[in-house]
């Protein structure tokens, strides 16, 4: 805390990318889908008692009801349209306590790291997704991973988003 105050007093400026989500901003992550509501849906009492394990237990409940969203994601490099169970636009080396989910992160390059996970069609594809995530193999037929300066996300239904770990509202286009 003292270091932060000292930096402010010295006017040392650290520039970093900030995202815009409609009328809101985010510095860390904008995400939808599987597990993204865990940070704000886990009860404070449970967090106080169990700490990080509270998030794990709350997340485990989500595995019984995996919802997919049909979306069209447009960037300066093209269009991706598919059914996704998870997506994140981030500017961080770790998300939700998981380190190195994104690679080659530069927090002031004007680019965001994007990860989109396609709805698996069967248990083998779900296993492949988990294996790829654990092995940090981020580009496959089931996981899109890329950098983008700007994204437009369109969905056929309302989709709940989290912005920097807080509820960011539901959007449909």
For each feature predicted by the language model, list its residue ranges:
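Accessory alpha-helical/coil subdomains and C-terminal extensions
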Residues: 48-76, 80
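Glycine-rich phosphate/pyrophosphate-binding beta-alpha loops
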Residues: 31, 35, 88-102, 167
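Small-residue-rich beta-alpha loop regions that form the catalytic core of phosphotransfer
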Residues: 1-53
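Gly/Ser/Thr-rich active-site loops/lids in small-molecule metabolic enzymes
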Residues: 46-54, 94, 103-124
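ATP/nucleoside-binding phosphotransfer catalytic cores, i.e., glycine-rich phosphate-binding loops
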Residues: 75-77, 81, 106, 116-173
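A short, compositionally biased
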Residues: 10-17, 63-70, 146-148, 153-157, ...
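Short acidic/glycine-rich loop or secondary-structure boundary segments that cap or lie
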Residues: 36-38, 81-83, 95-98, 122-125
